[in-house]
Amino acid sequence: IQTGTYKDLMIDIARHSYTTKSFGRFKYLYRIMGIFGRIKDKKRIDIQAVSCLKHDSLAFLEKIYCPTLIIGAEKDDVLGADGSLGLHQHIKGSQLIILPECGHALYEQNKNFQKRVLVFLES
């Protein structure tokens, strides 16, 4: 699956994890990491990638009965906000929050994320 270099992989991960604005701030760091980092086990990365693409746990979501907080990101180009909405629709009684101006790595990009999680855990 992965045919490029480690540097290509790092940049691709960053590009899909962050908003365009945030990626602009981190792109040089990821390029440096890509230059000095190495893929230790290419086969393992391929297995993980295939698992991400083929794994379907939708049937198990209806078996979740504990309080569940789903926090999605408006600009998530990995799962999309629709992915978070889909989880919410299948987990009875779940709470859904979509944070604006965030990408897939919303936990790193939005201070509101930590506040929302803390409020949920304390409730």
Regions found by a protein language model. Give the residues of each.
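Helix-rich cap/lid subdomain of alpha/beta-hydrolase
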Residues: 1-33
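Active-site acidic short loop of glycosyltransferases
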Residues: 65-66, 93
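Hydrophobic, aromatic-rich cap/lid helix
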Residues: 33-57
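C-terminal alpha-helix
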Residues: 116-123
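Catalytic histidine-centered segment of alpha/beta-hydrolase-like enzymes
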Residues: 96-114
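Short beta-strand/loop motif that positions the catalytic acidic residue
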Residues: 64, 70-72, 76
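Conserved alpha/beta-hydrolase "acid-adjacent" motif
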Residues: 77-83
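The feature captures the conserved acid-bearing segment of alpha/beta-hydrolase catalytic domains
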Residues: 56-65
